[in-house]
């Protein structure tokens, strides 16, 4: 993040009379909880992003057992760079995973030869886009936004919902 949210948090806290607590997690603690995050997910996931969320819920659980979440607001209201950056809109693939060749290299050589990651991703991307209903009245820009919204809601958002639910429930914390 280019700027801290503290100014806005304090402003909201003052005007809405809410009670906020700051949770600071350091790098060694993030690393310590990587395995727990992987267990919570039942597979490797987003590494430190998962462990930080798991630790966040662990700390919040000390005060309460259930919470409303703002998860998916960016997906619904177009808060990600791929909703407005031309290079992302015109990437021809899922905009949050443009670096397919780098991901292919993560596979061991035997699996890498058997799995054509690019072909699979292209297939799923095009299959998903074929389900998007473009209106006759849509401008090209609106059609692209409609496509990117569909991809985000049906792929990216589902991943985040699953991730949040698993990290919370690992701590006995419930999200709504």
Where are these regions (language model features)?
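ATP-dependent adenylate-handling active sites, centered on carboxylate activation for C-N bond formation
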Residues: 1-145, 160-176
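Catalytic donor/gating beta->alpha subdomain of glycosyltransferases that bind UDP-sugars
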Residues: 157
């Amino acid at each position: 993040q280019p700027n801290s949210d503290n100014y806005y948090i304090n402003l909201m806290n003052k005007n809405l009379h809410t009670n906020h607590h700051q949770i600071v997690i350091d790098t060694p603690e993030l690393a310590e909880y990587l395995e727990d995050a992987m267990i919570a997910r039942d597979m490797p996931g987003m590494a430190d992003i998962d462990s930080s969320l798991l630790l966040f819920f662990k700390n919040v659980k000390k005060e309460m057992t259930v919470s409303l979440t703002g998860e998916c607001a960016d997906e619904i209201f177009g808060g990600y760079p791929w909703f407005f950056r031309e290079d992302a809109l015109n990437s021809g693939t899922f905009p949050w995973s443009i670096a397919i060749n780098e991901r292919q290299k993560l596979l061991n050589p035997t699996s890498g030869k058997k799995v054509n990651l690019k072909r699979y991703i292209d297939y799923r991307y095009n299959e998903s886009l074929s389900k998007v209903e473009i209106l006759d009245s849509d401008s090209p820009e609106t059609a692209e936004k409609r496509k990117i919204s569909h991809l985000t809601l049906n792929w990216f958002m589902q991943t985040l919902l699953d991730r949040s639910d698993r990290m919370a429930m690992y701590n006995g914390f419930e999200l709504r």
